[in-house]
């Protein structure tokens, strides 16, 4: 799979133009991956940048979802390690939730890989706009007390979010954070830390299935993975130092811009 154009003819000017355009696309997606990982390591939502960006350069939906999962694994590994090293990964049932997220994502990925590209091209913009509206309208809970009656429901929620990540993905991290705050009453930093682990699990499950089915564009994924590592390291360090105060304004701005771009497209 070549991005974004296939070379036709043998004239040097055509070849030079092709190389220039392909290199430009790689450079743009590298930058996008860096900022997506930076944002995602703080509060989730990085897929709201990478997914539409890859679609806009002409990649098929399944190639987009597969390559996005591959490169995202590198960012989530980096941010998970940073939060763990700084003592924020304290959730006692983290391995249980990780398993739920992994299984849910696997089921979602198996489903999405059976859907035609034409259907995905119609569904993905709708899901993106819905996720963007969610970030804009939801103010987020503060001071929520732990609700023991909803723990069983929470297990289903973790599975469902994992399924969503395997089926589509953008906004998964933010949904996990909100679930831990609203249902379990965890604080924002602990919620963010466990979210990175669950997101890593769901990303990896989806990546394995997509890789087996041959949808991953490896060279593009590796280029974006380098940016993911740098962005996740920078973002998680920034979040650990500054906390929640900068997260929501960034997400709202990004969501608005993406919604406008998708509607125009």
Identify the residue ranges that each predicted region occupies.
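Selected transmembrane alpha-helices and immediately adjacent juxtamembrane segments
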Residues: 15-60, 143-192
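Single conserved hydrophobic/aromatic residue that forms the stacking wall/gate
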Residues: 1-16
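Membrane-interface alpha-helices at helix entry/exit sites of multi-pass transporters
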Residues: 60-68, 91-93, 185-196
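Selective hydrophobic functional segments
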Residues: 66-119, 203-249, 253
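Transmembrane helix exit motif
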Residues: 78-88, 117, 125-150, 259-265
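Residue-level signature of transmembrane alpha-helical entry/exit and packing/kink sites
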Residues: 25-29, 93, 97, 121-124, ...
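Residues within membrane-spanning alpha-helices of integral membrane proteins
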Residues: 26, 69, 125-128, 132, ...
